Amino acid sequence: MRVKSIKLTNFKKFKDEHFEFNDDVNIFVGDNNAGKSTILEALEIVLNYSYRGRPFNSEFTPDIFNKDAVQLFLASDKSATHLPVLAIEAFIEGVPEYRGTNNFLKADAQGITVLVRFDDTLKDVYADHLLTNPHITSIPIEFYKLEWLDFGWNPVKAVAKKFRALYIDPTRIHPTLGKNQYISTILNTALKKEELVKLTLNYRENQQVFNNSGEVRTVNTGLDTDHLITEKKLSIAASTLPAGSIQTSLQLEVDDVPFQFIGKGEQSNVQIKLAIQNKSKDIDLVMMEEPENHLSHINLNKLVHYIENQRGDKQLFLTTHSSYVLNKLSIDKICLVQSGYKRLHKLAPAVVKTLKRLPGYDTLRVALSHKVILVEGPSDELVLKKIYHRKHNRLPEQDGIDIIVVRGVGFDTFISVGMEIGTRINVLRDNDGDYEENVVKVRADYAAYPNIKLISSAKNEEFSLEPAMIYANATDLVTLDAFAKVVLSTQTFNLYDKVVDLDKRRDFLIDWFRSVQGNGKGARKVDSAIKLFDGTLNFMYPPFLDEVFDFA
């Protein structure tokens, strides 16, 4: 069984949206309040008829209606014809019993629907209510009916459902209630069916042993000896559980500690692994919120590795704010929920492979940012931030511009992700002494993508940011000396001060910052950039750095 797509109508922030999914893994990413969790909630409602772990009909409130739909209703005459309909339609594959044409596409397809609409049998009652209460301020859900139907328009029964979907959320475990239905659901995933049968029989036999114990018999003998309560025999006995209910009387323990009292991170870890392992072999789909929550990086690494290797053929839906999770589970499984909806299923396989091997790249920043500047080192980042702050009296990130330091294969990787998503990316690149070869020719590779722009000095002698900054401040000795005074240590400045003329002082500075393999001058660059960032010098800079902030 696979969920191919879901159609949301008037559900929370989604007025009319259709989301297509991957058959294996779906990783929802987006800003806070973008709607990632809302899609998971919709899946839980339509697949399990459950909302936040409880039956949907008992949790149904006016708050789940789309605000625009509510406002349209409140602005109308509020008659029954203007009451909004809420629908969640899941198009699925592998369940032919749910085939029909009752879906928004009117297509012959397999699927199920949760339909929330006005109950026509209450039409007259609602009309009378409207006469006496014309100033309705919310959706009158008391006049609605909730239906769970397949695409053939047949009611879906939970006990006879043709698939099983599990939603993992440790926050649903109440710390004091202990043995609840949620834990019993997790237990079901941990036990084979034959194991559950054996446990049930053994549990019931032990109940009978308890009932026949001497202590219980003694209590029962003296319970109503004079028959003042009833003329019949009154006794105390262990409750006999119906078949299938034993799970509610059992609990998971970790190192002898009840599951509901262990740490949230371990709860999440155990639940996810049990669901993925699924000894009962009856789970088709697993949903989870931010598996990285409450986990250290090492434990997250172990968990992601487990999911990656043990998922089998289960379809997985999860939300995350972790670049590590999405890189390791495959970045081409991203479902970006932000100013629309976009999947990265067409991302180049080489990029996917690189990020699986090197999952530390913070690719999520490229996915979530609208404006990105890629730079080669932290010194570039500091200088750019100082320039921007000088002009605007605030840092670029305060205006939604994210400066990301990348190295080596990072440029191509980040640019590939940005090309697929459409993120506007300006790349500040060193020309390394050959502008034509290292910049002009590379630009040609991205000519078809107007959202990608490579920026560099066109002068070969300005081979990186440091010489470009030095040339910009070498207009005269006073300006260059002031610049050198800030970026150099006192000891180095004394050496610089012994150099006789402007050109030689400029060359001294360029050579001082020139990096070659293994000379460790990167630290000098960062130290000097920090001094510029923290200082008050109104230094000069090359004009191409202004272009870095131009996203027009």
Language-model region placement:
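Switch/communication elements of ASCE P-loop NTPase nucleotide-binding domains
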Residues: 1-48, 245-366, 381-385, 389, ...
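Extended helical coiled-coil dimerization/tether regions that scaffold
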Residues: 187-270, 274-285
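Conserved catalytic network of the ASCE P-loop NTPase/AAA+ motor domain
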Residues: 79-83, 104-107, 276-281, 308-312, ...
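Conserved nucleotide-binding/hydrolysis micro-motifs of P-loop NTPases
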Residues: 94-96, 117-122, 152-153, 292, ...
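Surface-exposed acidic, glycine/proline-enriched linker/cap segments
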Residues: 62-78, 349-368
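Electropositive, glycine-dotted interaction segments
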Residues: 93-214
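Conserved P-loop NTP-binding catalytic core
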Residues: 42-106
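Acidic, Mg2+-coordinating catalytic modules of nucleic-acid enzymes
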Residues: 362-372, 381-552
